[in-house]
Regions:
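Long, ordered, helix-rich scaffold segments
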Residues: 1-401
Length: 401
C-alpha cells in the first residue's frame, strides 16, 4: 500500500499537480523505500515548496542510509542558513557510506557561504562538534579554526585520543608550516605515546605528500631516545627526510651497536640514506668494509642502498652472495633487488661478471623464475655465474609417464 501511495505521488508530479502534503506524510512511512521515494519527489519540487526544512532534518537522522542520502540531497535544494549543520548530522550513528559522505562533502562546498564566513567573523565552531568542523573544513580545503583547535589541544581540552588522531590527520593534509611546528611542539610536550604517534605520523604524512617541513626540526632528535619502537621509527624517518644533521651521531651510534634490534637498525639505515651526502657515503663504506661488521649488518646496508645506489649495492651484493653463510640468502638480498627494475638490471650486470656457488645461485634462480617480472637478464646471469642449466618449465610425455 505504501508503494502504491508513492506511485500516485509520482503521477501527480508528472502531471504538474504535485501533492506536497501527501509526499510529506509519506516521508514518515514505516517503509524506508517509501520514505526515500517521498523525499526524492520533494527534492525535485523543493525550489517551489515551503516548509521542507523539518522534513529534511528528520530524514538525516533516519535509520536508513538511503533515506539519509535523500535527506541531504533535499537540504541542498533549500535556502536555509542551517543546511550544512543539519547535513553533517547525517554521518552520526551510521556505518561509513561513500555516497552519503560525498553528498555531505558536496553540500559543505556548495553552501560554503552559509557557514564559513560566519565562522571567520565570530571565530566559533558553527557545528555540533569538532569532527564536523574538521570534515567541513576539509571539504572546502581551508584551515578554518586551526589555531583554535591547536590551542584546545595544548590546553588539554580534547580528551579523546581518536579525536586527537582526526585533528592530526587533518593538519597533515591542510595545516601550514606554522601549524605543523605547533604539532611538533605538542609531540615533545606530551608523555602519551598514542598522541606522540598521532602528531609525528601527521608530520610524516605532510612531508611525504605535501613536502612541507615545520620549523625547529632539530626537536625530532629527542625521540631517538624513545623506548617505543614505533615512535623511534617515525622519528628516524623524519630526521632523515628533514635532513636533521644534528641527529647523525645518534643514528650512527645505534647502527654501530650490535645489540640494536633489526627494526631499529633498518630504520636508522634508511634515515642515514635519506640524510645522504658525503658523510653518509663515507660512513656506510666504512661500515661495509669493516671486517668486524656482522654479515647481517652488511646485508642490511646492501638492501638499503639497492634503490638509491643500485650499481654500488649490486657490486657489494655479489660479494656477500659469494660468501653467504650456509650457501643461503637469509637476509633477502635477492628479494631487495627483484623489487626494483633498475636494481635488478644492476645486479644482473654484476653477476654476469662473477661466479657464484651453486647453492646460492640455485636459490637466486628460483626466486627470479618465480618473480612476477621474471627478469630474463638476471636469470641468464645467475645461470652463467652458477653453472646452472635452464629450469624446465614443462615435462615431456616420457617424463610425465
Amino acid at each position: 500500500e505504501e508503494l502504491h501511495k508513492l506511485r500516485r505521488i509520482w503521477a501527480t508530479q508528472a502531471l504538474n499537480r504535485f501533492d506536497v502534503e501527501a509526499a510529506i506524510e509519506l516521508a514518515r512511512s514505516p517503509s524506508p523505500k517509501a520514505r526515500a521515494g517521498a523525499l526524492r519527489a520533494l527534492y525535485y519540487d523543493a525550489p517551489r515548496t515551503e516548509g521542507l526544512l523539518p522534513v529534511a532534518e528528520s530524514a538525516v537522522s533516519d535509520p536508513s542510509g538511503q533515506v539519509r542520502l535523500w535527506g541531504v540531497s533535499l537540504l541542498a535544494q533549500l535556502a536555509s542558513p542551517k543546511t550544512v549543520p543539519i547535513a553533517l548530522k547525517a554521518m552520526d550513528g551510521i556505518e561509513a557510506d561513500d555516497f552519503l559522505d560525498f553528498a555531505v562533502w558536496s553540500i559543505c562546498r556548495e553552501h560554503r557561504d552559509r557557514w564559513a564566513d560566519e565562522m571567520k567573523e565570530k571565530g566559533k565552531n558553527p557545528f555540533a562538534n569538532l569532527s564536523q568542523l574538521l570534515f567541513a573544513s576539509s571539504a572546502i580545503g581551508e584551515r578554518l579554526g586551526a589555531d583554535r583547535i591547536l590551542a584546545s589541544l595544548s590546553d588539554g581540552k580534547i580528551k579523546d585520543d581518536q579525536t586527537v588522531w582526526d585533528i592530526a590527520n587533518w593538519m597533515a593534509n591542510e595545516g601550514s608550516p606554522a601549524h605543523l611546528s605547533k604539532l611538533l611542539g605538542l609531540a615533545t610536550e606530551t608523555k602519551s605515546v598514542t598522541r606522540q604517534h598521532a602528531y609525528m605520523n601527521a608530520l610524516l604524512t605532510a612531508k611525504k605528500l605535501r613536502k612541507i617541513n615545520p620549523s625547529g626540526t632539530d626537536r625530532i632528535a629527542s625521540f631517538l631516545n624513545s623506548e617505543n619502537d614505533t615512535i623511534f621509527g617515525v622519528a628516524a624517518q623524519l630526521a632523515g627526510l628533514w635532513k636533521v644533521e644534528s641527529s647523525r651521531p645518534a643514528l650512527e651510534k645505534i647502527l654501530n651497536d650490535d645489540r640494536a634490534s633489526p627494526v631499529r637498525s633498518k630504520a636508522v639505515l634508511q634515515a642515514l640514506i635519506s640524510l645522504g651526502g658525503e658523510k653518509t657515503n663515507s660512513y656506510l663504506n666504512q661500515l661495509f668494509g669493516d671486517p668486524k661488521t656482522p654479515y647481517g649488518r652488511k646485508a642490511m646496508v646492501v638492501t638499503g642502498q639497492s634503490k638509491a645506489q643500485p650499481i654500488l649495492a649490486a657490486r657489494r651484493a655479489v660479494k656477500l652472495l659469494q660468501g653467504a653463510p650456509g650457501g643461503k640468502d637469509k637476509f633477502g638480498i635477492y628479494a631487495a633487488f627483484l623489487g626494483n627494475r633498475g636494481a635488478t638490471r644492476a645486479l644482473a650486470t654484476e653477476i654476469s661478471q662473477a661466479n657464484l656457488p651453486e647453492p646460492i645461485a640455485l636459490q637466486g634462480l628460483q626466486l627470479a623464475e618465480s618473480s612476477p617480472t621474471r627478469p630474463k637478464e638476471l636469470i641468464a646471469a645467475i645461470q652463467k655465474a652458477g653453472g646452472l642449466k635452464p629450469m624446465k618449465m614443462s615435462l615431456s610425455l616420457s617424463e610425465m609417464a
